Amino acid sequence: MRLILLLSLFVVAFAAELPLAEECDETKCLLPRCRCSSTNIPGGLAPRDVPQFVSVTFDDAVNVINIETYREVLYGRSNSNGCPAGATFYVSHEYTNYVLVNELYNRGYEVSLHSMTHQTPQTYWAEADYDVLVKEFADQKSLMSHFALIPDQEIRGVRLPFLQMNGNASFQMMADSGLVYDNSWPTVSHVNPGLWPYTLDYASIHDCIVPPCPSASIPGPWVIPMISWSDLNGSPCSMADSCYFTPPLDDENAWYNFILTNFERHYHGNRAPFGFYIHEWYLAVNPAVKAALVRFMNYVNNLNDAFMVNANQIIEWVQNPIPVSEYIRRPCRRFSSTPCRATSCGPLRSEHNGLDYWMQVCNTCPRVYPWLGNPLGR
């Protein structure tokens, strides 16, 4: 209780520098730049006319081990409209192989930010000020663009470590750094119907599960709510691998039905985006869960009105909502691939802990291992 009080005092102090968000005025908060937090479908569409977006995401470092899972379960997939199926990777820096990050980007998947350090304790993230968050995320954007050869403007999203909210500071950092959306904020109160993405121009109805949550008016960044699943006991879980009462981990059919039940709450409801949020290790140690995910993605890829997409594609649709009958006729997403000249670097001394690291990059080698305050390792 004392921790929550301290965190609340911290966010109030920071918010003093920013205007307090007021109740949303729908006559002033208009697409494409502003949207009130609401379970109402963008554009006033009927549920049957809404494309059901599915957001498959993976967190943490990309390496030679987990890339095998990504290649196995994701590569070569297409939605029913013929466009490539998307997924989003929230990448943390330490131990990441940037040649493989480049591979994911060139396959059309979205690469977003999960911090430079992903350090513990969790209170570090709750208490981090604006300057710390610039070093953790804005500098990571520069690092990712440089070493994985991803165009700076293609790196758009953030997921805070441990889903630990930070009040206003993280969103202010995003607004100043050209970052488009956050996908860290769980909701257990706005699940059925689900909470659609929105901006922070005005006060949010979003329940604050991991305080402190933003209180200021911060135009620019979007929130993609992490709409919780319900486990077999009816308890909420923000990520698939955080559910407590699950089917047996060796029962593929039971897990498939578990995923499908949570999906259908969206699909037969207001069609707010459905998230399958997970860490790769959970699939690696539970082959039946991996097989269930593959079956579920196969199912989605054969539905005429459901689409696996990158997270930013959800924001783009919300900004310009069109019926599914039009959506399926739109051209597929286009982007410029960036060929990588793979370079192995190391040993690189880390100035933060004195250890030696090896890096795989698509650029010239850094002098030292990149870290806070020195994202390019110069």
Task: Show the residue positions of the predicted features.
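Cleavable N-terminal signal peptides of Sec/SRP-targeted secreted and luminal proteins
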Residues: R2-A16
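Processing junctions and N-termini across compartments
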Residues: L9, L18, E23, K28-L30, ...
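Active-site beta->alpha N-cap acidic-glycine motif
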Residues: E17-S112, T117-Q122, Y130-E136, K141-H146, ...
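Short acidic, glycine/proline-rich loop/turn micro-motifs
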Residues: Q122-A126, S235-C237
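Short low-complexity, flexible loop/linker segments enriched in glycine and/or proline
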Residues: A126-D129, L195-Y202, P323-S325
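Aromatic-lined glycan-binding groove of carbohydrate-active enzymes
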Residues: P197-H266
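C-terminal regions of proteins
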Residues: A311-Y357
